[in-house]
């Protein structure tokens, strides 16, 4: 974990510059900041000696916006998705993140924060997500609503509605994203106990929202949940077989 901190401090001036420039209509600032953040994560994983293995069942089209929906069991999830998700994107995160020194400032500038206990904050964040998608920038969201699963890899059921409502409204595809084993590498509640294991990520085929209405949101939500659940179950079954 020390590698993440030291490399972040080294690259923070570049991230900060990109964050400042990202307020303009020119995408240069966003590209600069995202490039620095990806470099940070990529180098940190190299220093940790931990490879990331991505199963590209689908390769996102450059310049196209998607809503990426991933399971969320570990604080490692943000670092991993920050490296593997291509293009320009915005995370949806809790407002508490901005209290973190330096990282919180960067996160608030580049991403979208929401106070889930506040209807006003949820409405504002949803509107900001709509504008982000309309500008051709993807959204990365953890539709469980945080790290709330008590028994990973069993996810919280059901997913929250926001991701699916915004995808339908903007007619943007949903891409289910399975973070297969982060909960074993960095278990929630044990932030400084990293277990070495190659990181496994699966980009599933996109689910089209073309022609869908809000009446289809529940079906879309269920379909996304089952795709991720199936992949997690395959991993669990494989581990059980391997240990016999």
Where are these regions (language model features)?
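N-terminal membrane-anchoring alpha-helices
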Residues: 1-53
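Catalytic core of membrane glycerolipid acyltransferases/transacylases, capturing the structured
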Residues: 18-35, 47, 61-119
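Soluble or luminal CAZymes and related metallo-dependent hydrolases
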Residues: 32-36, 121, 216, 220
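Generic preference for hydrophobic
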Residues: 54, 68, 91, 201-203
């Amino acid at each position: 974990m020390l590698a993440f901190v030291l490399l972040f401090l080294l690259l923070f001036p570049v991230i900060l510059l990109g964050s400042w420039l990202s307020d303009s209509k020119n995408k240069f600032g966003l590209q600069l900041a995202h490039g620095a953040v990806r470099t940070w994560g990529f180098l940190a994983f190299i220093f940790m000696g931990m490879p990331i293995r991505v199963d590209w069942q689908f390769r996102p089209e450059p310049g196209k916006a998607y809503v990426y929906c991933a399971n969320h069991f570990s604080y490692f999830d943000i670092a991993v998705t920050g490296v593997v998700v291509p293009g320009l994107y915005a995370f949806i995160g809790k407002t508490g993140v901005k209290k973190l020194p330096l990282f919180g400032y960067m996160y608030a500038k580049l991403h979208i924060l929401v106070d889930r206990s506040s209807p006003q904050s949820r409405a504002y964040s949803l509107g900001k997500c709509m504008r982000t998608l309309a500008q051709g920038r993807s959204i990365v969201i953890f539709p469980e609503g945080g790290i709330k699963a008590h028994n990973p890899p069993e996810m919280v059921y059901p997913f929250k509605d926001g991701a699916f409502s915004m995808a339908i409204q903007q007619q943007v595809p949903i891409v289910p994203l399975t973070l297969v084993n982060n909960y074993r590498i960095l278990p929630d509640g044990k932030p400084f106990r990293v277990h070495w294991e190659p990181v496994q990520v699966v980009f599933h085929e996109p689910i089209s929202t073309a022609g869908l209405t809000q009446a289809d949101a529940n079906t879309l939500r269920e379909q996304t949940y089952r795709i991720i659940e199936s992949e997690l179950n395959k991993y669990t079954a494989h581990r059980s077989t391997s240990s016999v």
